[in-house]
Amino acid sequence: MAVNLLKTQQFSTISIAASFLKPIESAAEPEEETIYFYSAAAHLKQQIIDAFGYAAGCRFMYSANLFFDQQLKTCGTRLIHPSFNKNLHLDALMKTFADMSFPSSLSADAVEKAKDELLLKIEKKFADPFSYSAARLAEEAFGNPMYGTAMFGRKDRIQAIHPQRFLNATDFIVDLLSQHKQLNILGHVQACDIPGHASQTSAVTAGRFLVNRHVFETETRSAAGPSVLTLGFDCGEMKDASDYIKIQLIDGLLGKYGHSALFKHFREKDLAVYHVITRYDIMNNLLLVSICTNQLHEKEIPPRVLEAVSHFSADERELEQAKQFFRNEMLLQFDSPEGLLAYMGILRRFSCTKEDLLDGISAVTCRDVLQFITTINYIGAHVVRG
């Protein structure tokens, strides 16, 4: 097990995130393991509340996600620092995560609850036209559903799972214990007295090979209603943390936080759009721009977005605003179990510290972002009608 301790006095809370990383074969069926992990994590949450009080477990979270040929399962909690809660024994709580115990069997009710939770999560992702369109664009560009909608999960496999499969959970426990486990802790923690820990960890990685740079797919859910168009831009090779910061700031300047350069561009062109969402997908290394508009304007949108990106500009005031939004978002993410896990992966990937990222944000100039945006390349679009 790897233990990563990120000491900081910046927060009045402590975030703890445990994760399990498992390579899977393309034909593997991780759904059963996900059901077991959801139930086991719910069991751990109750154990923590019983042992350490409601405040230690009320913000407990868990998730299981597929990333290409790997499955990442996460559980964790965020709690008020012990200096504000004298009854909390932090060392014992951290040890509980380090020595996580798993139930030897699951009740039918626990299995059905986990199934329902997972199915609802999948349905929400497929129903959200922005998430769906972005996933379809990625899988077409990379020629593999594992880069897109397959990451959402497979409803038919989950629905077919029977509770009897979990009456004896020995094989699930053995499998979990054999996976690469890491424990990430952020906060003002003096020490992490967990024997046998190592500091070196592995990150979720994948080989990216674009097989199609001329994607244009259209799917019709309904003849009525608006359309959602998602345009993708390949961001090339991320050489260091500076490149990561630049693309995040470009994302913010284009429209991630609401003060949207794209909305302004559409207004100037007298083209009404309902919604604009931009986001940088770090797993696929794509900048995604999603526009919700009337079906009548579908064909007008892509050239306008390309024009806005190719003529991208930003002044000092706009850049400073984007920087502050990005700092706030980053610190908010760090102060949560899932966000902590994600950013620990970024710190490892670029061999930097949290302070390096914050300093790097301050150092970026308008010229830097203007130069960087010229290196990204349009790969295509996906349209969902209705």
Swiss-Prot record:
Record-linked SUPFAM superfamilies: LuxS/MPP-like metallohydrolase
GO biological process, one term: bacteriocin biosynthetic process
Leader sequence segment: none
Job of this protein: Involved in the production of the bacteriocin subtilosin.
Keywords assigned by UniProt, alphabetized: Antibiotic biosynthesis, Bacteriocin biosynthesis
Protein known as: Antilisterial bacteriocin subtilosin biosynthesis protein AlbE
Organism for this UniProt entry: Bacillus subtilis
A GO MF label: metal ion binding
InterPro entries (UniProt xref): Metalloenz_LuxS/M16 (IPR011249), Peptidase_M16_C (IPR007863)
